[in-house]
UniProtKB/Swiss-Prot annotation:
It comes from the Bacteria. Keywords: Cell inner membrane, Cell membrane, Membrane. It is found in: Cell inner membrane. Belongs to the UPF0161 family. Its main location: membrane. The keyword Cell inner membrane applies. This is Putative membrane protein insertion efficiency factor. NCBIfam families: membrane protein insertion efficiency factor YidD. Signal peptide: none annotated. The keyword Cell membrane applies.
Length: 118
């Protein structure tokens, strides 16, 4: 479920986060209070949300990463339409791609899912 609304902006943000992971984060000790790390959280959100919504959620996540927060496991969430499970066997085999993410429904709403990378 790639975000195709603004692929250019998503590509710029994704490239900058990958650059941060490769060149800056690789030379510092691992000190993230959350799982997934803030940079992985950002990459996962950019796959499912529009870049502006993703940047808002990423900013909240980065602001919550401070000494006064206990951290823990905090998966990103997204709102999606429930996928149709009524597909023929032929369509499923033809359209099947490698599973990259699990979308686990939250208890808040049927349209809100946790994004978990496989």
């Amino acid at each position: 479920m790639r975000n195709n609304k603004t692929p250019f902006l998503s590509a710029i943000f994704t490239a900058s986060i990958r650059g941060y992971q490769r060149f800056f984060s690789a030379f510092t000790f691992s000190s993230c209070r959350f799982y997934p790390t803030c940079s992985n959280y950002a990459l996962w959100l950019l796959c499912f949300e529009s870049p502006l919504v993703a940047m808002g959620k990423i900013a909240i996540r980065i602001l919550s990463c401070n000494p006064f927060c206990s951290g823990g496991i905090a998966y990103p969430t997204t709102r999606l339409k429930r996928p149709s499970l009524l597909q023929s066997h032929k369509d499923f085999n033809r359209n099947f791609k490698t599973i990259t993410f699990w979308l686990v429904p939250t208890t808040k709403s049927r349209a809100t899912y946790y994004i978990i990378k496989v």
